[in-house]
A protein has these predicted regions:
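Core catalytic lobe of class I
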Residues: 2-309, 327
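PRPP-dependent phosphoribosyltransferase catalytic core
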Residues: 308-328
Length: 328
């Protein structure tokens, strides 16, 4: 493998290098789950490396490169298992072959259905699209981060037809065709809730309930939150450290996927001991989420500063698990 650097432990492997070089070493039907956030088709540039999928000249060029990754993910995923993609609408006009990126800070900028094009690509590569979750974002927080004038109250004063939406993130679910050889079963239901809501105290007695599962009110409550198509209970700031990973000329965008989102995906769509893979590792969030839930995590990241931050973050995974055990 043309890998720049690697860190291999019993329960995780981190690679600094091209994700295609990492994936080609996997045998067919090996991965229990993949979860990742791809570069948003050039909306943010993370490096000048020509292998970096964020470093593209057009929306179409991004998808031409991304298709190779999706096909490899299809090959290495177990039949019947899930590939989860975190994404959102992006500023611009048109879709597919006509799409042209715009600037999100400009008033009146349209939106490109980036999730829709991801869905169509996955279907082209053999995946079955089987649902999406929307992840709520606080409007003022989005306004302050992006400085989009269309989210400012002043735009209401001037012309509210040009107001924007604090666009929700989306987690798309794709299932590989075929029968799942190892069901992801939960004989005593779900044991832990990842989110900001407070579970009613009287339900705690049902945690790990071994009786008739129709009576497991603890797990039922968690599942109602997870089954919703709109996740408005994600702790937005529950992310891994990332500030040290920034280069001096970095975009301001770097913001890892929330651990609540990752934990839900890992628990729902993989078994303990299975491999969870992320081709766009960033600072290691998906690998971390796999490891702390007794899975094996593998991640590939091209950018050296992100990789080094991932190494630091994963080194603290045992400490995190210990702290969580003390909280229980």
């Amino acid at each position: 493998m043309a890998i720049i650097e690697s860190t291999i432990k019993d329960n995780y492997a981190l690679y600094c290098g091209d994700n295609m070089e990492v994936m080609k070493e996997f045998p067919d039907n090996k991965i229990g789950l993949s979860i990742y956030s791809p570069p948003f088709c050039g909306l943010y540039n993370y490096s000048s490396d020509p292998r970096d999928d964020s470093n593209c000249d057009s929306y179409q060029q991004f998808f031409a490169a991304y298709e190779f990754k999706v096909r490899e993910l299809f090959r290495i995923t177990m039949p019947g298992r899930i590939s989860a993609v975190h994404c959102m609408d992006v500023p611009g006009v048109g879709n597919g072959e006509t799409a042209k990126m715009g600037c999100g800070a400009n008033v009146g900028t349209g939106l490109i259905d980036f999730p829709g094009d991801i869905i169509r690509l996955h279907e082209k590569c053999g995946f079955i699209y089987c649902g999406r979750r929307h992840i709520w974002k606080e409007p003022l927080g989005v306004r302050l981060r992006t400085m989009a004038k269309g989210l400012a109250h002043q735009q209401i004063v001037e012309d509210s037809t040009l107001c924007d939406v604090a666009t929700a993130d989306q987690l798309l679910m794709f299932r590989k065709k075929g029968d799942n050889p190892i069901p992801v079963a939960h004989p005593t239901g779900l044991h832990r809730y990842a989110g900001e809501r407070v579970m009613p105290h009287e339900l705690q007695v049902f945690k790990g309930f071994k009786g008739k599962q129709t009576e497991n009110r603890y797990s039922h409550w968690i599942w109602r939150q997870y089954a919703s198509s709109f996740w408005d209970d994600i702790r937005i700031d529950n992310v891994l450290p990332y500030e040290e990973s920034r280069d001096t000329d970095d975009e301001k965008h770097c913001h890892p996927l929330q651990l609540d989102v990752i934990e839900r995906a890992v628990i729902l769509w993989s078994n303990e001991g299975e491999i969870v893979f992320t081709p766009y590792m960033g600072v290691g969030s998906e690998v971390f989420g796999a490891v702390i839930n007794n899975r094996k995590g593998i991640g590939a990241e091209l950018k050296a500063t992100y990789y080094k931050q991932a190494v630091r973050n994963l080194a603290k995974s045992d400490e995190y698990v210990h702290e969580q055990m003390l909280i229980k």
